[in-house]
């Protein structure tokens, strides 16, 4: 436990040192684009859009969903449709500009109606994450496929906000990279309430990184539903994950 805490402290220290370099990277990549100031402000917790609006008295709260890029956004879109149809509001974040553009176009109506808010993901800095969570006030967080951040998951756990990895995929090369920061990886696994893996190989690798078997479900890939019509069934309930993880 002490080793994990020390590694997390060291990780946080490195992140604080790297923030100026990351800001420079964002500037180099984006400064010629019209939304450069918006991207920087959102990544560093300076300015966010308004939270989603509850459309009726039966609203269930805001779910934060993070999808890295275009592919992950396409994959998770039908699930977000179902959650909104069941009374949840969504805050969608992306890492890449292509992912952000896809999110904005795929959910243009939902964003205009106020049922969804959309921004770039905050940098993995404790202070920035605190600002983001205070603004969004999510009841749960969904992360799509692979991209996980230690400080984000730690802060969510501290605020007792369950984190769920959906469509979880961990290739052999990614697994080796996570093994290089084993203590930090173990911390991230322990801070996830539920891991919904694409396949048994990924599930095994998540366990080897420190996830408990009770945390993991193997459910196949979400990608088969990319082209299905928008759903409005009553089969999705985020509260079910608490019961699942207690089995």
Task: Mark where each language-model region is.
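Active-site and donor-binding regions of nucleotide-sugar-utilizing enzymes
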Residues: 23, 27-49, 53-228
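Hydrophobic alpha-helical transmembrane segments of integral membrane proteins
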Residues: 16-17, 140
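Acidic, glycine-rich loop-and-beta core segments that form the ion-binding/anion-interacting portion
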Residues: 218, 223-247
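Compositionally biased, charge-rich terminal segments
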Residues: 1-15
């Amino acid at each position: 436990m002490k080793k994990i805490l020390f590694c997390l402290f060291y990780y946080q220290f490195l992140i604080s040192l790297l923030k100026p370099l990351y800001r420079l990277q964002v500037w180099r990549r984006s400064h010629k684009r019209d939304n450069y100031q918006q991207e920087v402000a959102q990544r560093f917790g300076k300015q966010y859009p308004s939270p989603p609006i509850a459309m009726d008295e039966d609203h269930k709260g805001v779910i934060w969903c993070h999808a890295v890029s275009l592919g992950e956004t396409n994959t998770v879109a039908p699930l977000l449709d179902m959650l909104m149809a069941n009374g949840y509001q969504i805050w969608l974040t992306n890492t890449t500009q292509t992912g952000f553009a896809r999110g904005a176009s795929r959910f243009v109506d939902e964003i205009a109606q106020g049922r969804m808010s959309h921004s770039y993901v905050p940098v993995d800095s404790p202070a920035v994450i605190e600002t983001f969570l205070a603004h969004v006030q999510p009841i749960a967080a969904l992360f799509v496929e692979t991209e996980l951040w230690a400080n984000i998951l730690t802060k969510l756990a501290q605020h007792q906000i369950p984190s769920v990895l959906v469509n979880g995929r961990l290739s052999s090369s990614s697994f080796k990279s996570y093994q290089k920061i084993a203590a930090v990886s173990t911390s991230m696994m322990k801070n996830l309430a539920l891991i919904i893996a694409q396949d048994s190989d990924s599930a095994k690798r998540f366990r080897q990184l420190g996830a408990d078997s009770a945390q993991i479900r193997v459910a196949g890939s979400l990608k088969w539903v990319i082209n299905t019509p928008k759903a409005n069934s009553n089969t999705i309930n985020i509260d079910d994950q608490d019961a699942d993880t207690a089995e």
